Amino acid sequence: MLSTAFITLVRSGRNQVKKRVLLSSILLQDHRQMTPACYCSISEPRCSRFDPDGSGQPATWDNFGIWDNRIDEPILLPPSIKYGKPIPKISLENVGCASLIGKRKENEDRFGFAQLTEEVLYFAVYDGHGGPAAADFCHTHMEKCVTDLLPREKDLETVLTLAFLEIDKAFSSYAHLSADASLLTSGTTATVALLRDGVELVVASVGDSRALLCRKGKPMKLTTDHTPERKDEKERIKKCGGFVAWNSLGQPHVNGRLAMTRSIGDLDLKASGVIAEPETTRIKLYHADDSFLVLTTDGINFMVNSQEICDFVNQCHDPKEAAHAVTEQAIQYGTEDNSTAVVVPFGAWGKYKNSEITFSFSRSFASSGRWA
């Protein structure tokens, strides 16, 4: 009996070896035919997300993770080869977005996302004030400005910094040539994220729109609000000749007018230190741990804290549902402002679904007014 079992085991092993040799041969042939722009479908055996190393063995929780609400995406071959691990392609079709007017007369929020090159994706939110002109200008021109800078500059933080400054300068020229004097007091926040090779995430921001990454179910803040409450920003405003005054709700404003210290536009406050130079953050994604990126405007941020945003999104089946859930939750919490969310799914989408949601009882129910 023992010898018979041993012979059966040996024969089984030989069959497995033959299968692996055949698979290796197929992989080698595919590798020779591969071009840098070629993306591999998950249905092909050479780079399945459930067989990342082509061994014929399914991935375990430790390798990548298998969960109920996962989004099956193709694998980006060149980055996967470069980094030595499977990098899922982020499909723009799966990006979720929603924008609600709230109790305002007009929705001054704008958002956008696009594939700029084979390697770089673009995501952005803009929250206008003093009319939608500045937000519209950014929405119309920022994408092209970034695209034009990419061939000349490899560092994405530098690309975004230059783009913000160029757009601000272009808007200034546009406003001064216009007969509409209201453009001189129109401004906008800007939070822009670039994703290169599905791994390198860079975020630039001015104002109080935010970006956060959900890693292992917890929020990782990628932006910091530019408000007069920040000591460094307040000192910078004073050094430039501006001042900070508080309104009846105890909210600080630059020159008694603007609730932020950095923005695109607001041309009448440039001499008082309101600048368009963004603060930037660079981070490397780990798709086994990172569920999504979410960009939000202050109609959400002043009502829903970062952990709540993570929890609400993690409860949803897909990013489109998640974006609507977050914006609608802000409305239910009593926000009066426009509310916009852009949700970008990553490799761990659905992995950290939590049956419990942590609520904050210290939320502010004051209007997030930009004007004193």
Curated annotation (Swiss-Prot):
Pathway named in the protein's UniProt entry: Protein modification
Subcellular location: Mitochondrion matrix
Transit peptide: 1-29
Subunit structure: Interacts with E1 and E2 components of the branched-chain alpha-ketoacid dehydrogenase (BCKDH) complex. Interacts with both BCKDHA and BCKDHB chains of the E1 subunit. Interacts with the 24-meric DBT/E2 core of the BCKD complex with a 1:1 stoichiometry; the N-terminal region (residues 49-61) of PPM1K and C-terminal linker of the lipoyl domain of DBT/E2 (residues 145-160) are critical for this interaction whereas the lipoyl prosthetic group is dispensable. Competes with BCKDK for binding to DBT/E2; this interaction is modulated by branched-chain alpha-keto acids (BCKAs).
Binding site for Mn(2+) 1: 127-128
Keywords on record: Hydrolase, Manganese, Metal-binding, Mitochondrion, Phosphoprotein, Protein phosphatase, Transit peptide
Phosphoserine modified-residue sites: 248
InterPro entries: PP2C, PP2C_BS, PPM-type-like_dom_sf, PPM-type_phosphatase-like_dom
Names of the cofactor(s): Mn(2+)
UniProt-recorded Gene Ontology molecular function terms: manganese ion binding; protein serine/threonine phosphatase activity
GO biological process, one term: branched-chain amino acid catabolic process
Database matches in Gene3D superfamilies: PPM-type phosphatase domain (3.60.40.10)
Reaction(s) the record says it catalyses: O-phospho-L-seryl-[3-methyl-2-oxobutanoate dehydrogenase] + H2O = L-seryl-[3-methyl-2-oxobutanoate dehydrogenase] + phosphate; O-phospho-L-seryl-[protein] + H2O = L-seryl-[protein] + phosphate
PANTHER family xrefs: PROTEIN PHOSPHATASE
Residues annotated to bind Mn(2+) 2: 127, 298, 337
Full protein name: Protein phosphatase Mn(2+)-dependent 1K
Record region (Critical for association with the BCKDH complex): 46-61
Predominant place of localization: mitochondrion
Family membership noted in the UniProt record: Belongs to the PP2C family.
Annotated EC: 3.1.3.16, 3.1.3.52
CDD domains named in the record: PP2Cc
Gene source species: Rattus norvegicus
SMART domains given in the database record: PP2C_SIG, PP2Cc
Top-rank EC class of the record's enzyme: hydrolase
